[in-house]
């Protein structure tokens, strides 16, 4: 399973309208490439995709900057749910949403017949992976901070919820492969 879900870019970006413009794809265009690239790198090519989408709010309020408090029209779906079947017959459910206030799910968690893995945030391309190969879920941490693209490189908090001085941020590296 894979999930990207939060309230939307209007909470931290002073000009969020392009993410919500007609035919711009909302969270699919914003975050989908990071998640889908990680899944393809882990599981191989997809052979079938089924999906649904919806728009929850007709308008949103800008939460920061000189236009703070202004309303703008939402012209694209803001929540997408898909099932992806890969060539190796793995089946993944993915949620990409700008409509979730809060959640505690892992970004990507994969289950197999020999174990499970929790993959670090594909948006930042850094952080530990957690693996369980025993019944009952004893999870082992596999740190990546000693790997070339796992070293912590954030000097100070940028006010984004997913960035902190304790994680690596090599955003876009996965996409460039």
Where are the language model's segments positioned?
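Glycine-rich beta-alpha junction loops
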Residues: 3-8, 53-58, 88-90, 98-100, ...
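Short acidic, gly/pro-rich beta-turn/loop elements at beta-sheet edges
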Residues: 10-12, 59-61, 92-94, 104, ...
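Acidic/polar loop patches that form or flank catalytic/metal-binding clefts of enzymes
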Residues: 45-51, 91-93, 116-120
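C-terminal glycine/acidic-rich active-site capping loop/insertion
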Residues: 58-75, 81, 85-86, 106-109, ...
């Amino acid at each position: 399973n894979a999930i990207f879900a939060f309230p939307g870019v209007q909470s931290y970006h002073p000009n969020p309208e392009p993410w919500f413009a007609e035919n711009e794809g909302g969270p699919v265009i914003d975050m989908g490439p990071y998640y889908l690239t990680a899944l393809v790198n882990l599981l191989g090519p997809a052979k079938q995709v089924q999906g649904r989408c919806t728009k929850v709010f007709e308008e949103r309020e800008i939460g920061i900057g000189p236009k703070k408090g202004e309303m703008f029209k939402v012209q694209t779906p803001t929540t997408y749910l898909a099932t992806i079947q890969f060539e190796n017959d793995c089946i993944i459910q993915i949620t990409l949403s700008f409509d979730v206030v809060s959640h505690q799910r892992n970004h990507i968690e994969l289950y197999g017949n020999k174990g499970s893995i929790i993959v670090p945030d594909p948006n930042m391309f850094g952080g530990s992976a957690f693996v369980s190969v025993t019944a009952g879920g004893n999870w082992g941490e596999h740190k990546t901070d000693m790997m070339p693209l796992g070293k912590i490189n954030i000097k100070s908090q940028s006010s984004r919820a997913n960035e902190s001085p304790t994680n690596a941020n090599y955003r876009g590296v996965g996409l460039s492969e």
